[in-house]
């Protein structure tokens, strides 16, 4: 990682993303915007990296760049989506973030 990994973002397993989109298409109101997200899957980047590294049997390495190099990286530290409108349509994620990552890694492993 090129920063401390404390950035906090909303991630979602693709199967949950698809079911969220279908929920909005079938039950949402035309012209309304919905965030396809799950509050329980909001995670710090360093924790996300740790889950992936643990699965791969690797260690997360932090390489903090100097000021000039870091100028090219995003300054965002938080990008969390509010899922309340989607939840009000009856949608709920079926996979937690760790399960989604492991399932993704298993699929990638199977095709390589």
Predicted regions span which residues?
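Conserved small/polar residues in nucleotide/adenosyl-binding loops
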Residues: 1
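Residue-level signal for the nucleotide or nucleotide-sugar donor/cofactor binding architecture
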Residues: 9-15, 43, 81, 92-96
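Amphipathic terminal alpha-helices
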Residues: 97-112
């Amino acid at each position: 990682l090129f920063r401390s990994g404390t950035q906090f973002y909303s991630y979602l397993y693709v199967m949950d993303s698809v079911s969220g989109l279908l929920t909005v298409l079938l039950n949402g109101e035309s012209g309304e915007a919905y965030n396809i997200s799950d509050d329980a899957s909001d995670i710090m980047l360093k924790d996300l990296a740790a889950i992936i590294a643990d699965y791969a049997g690797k260690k997360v390495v932090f390489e903090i760049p100097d000021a000039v190099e870091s100028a090219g990286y995003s300054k965002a530290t938080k990008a969390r989506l509010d899922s309340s409108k989607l939840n009000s349509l009856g949608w709920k994620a079926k996979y937690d973030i760790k399960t989604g990552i492991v399932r993704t890694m298993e699929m990638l492993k199977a095709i390589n």
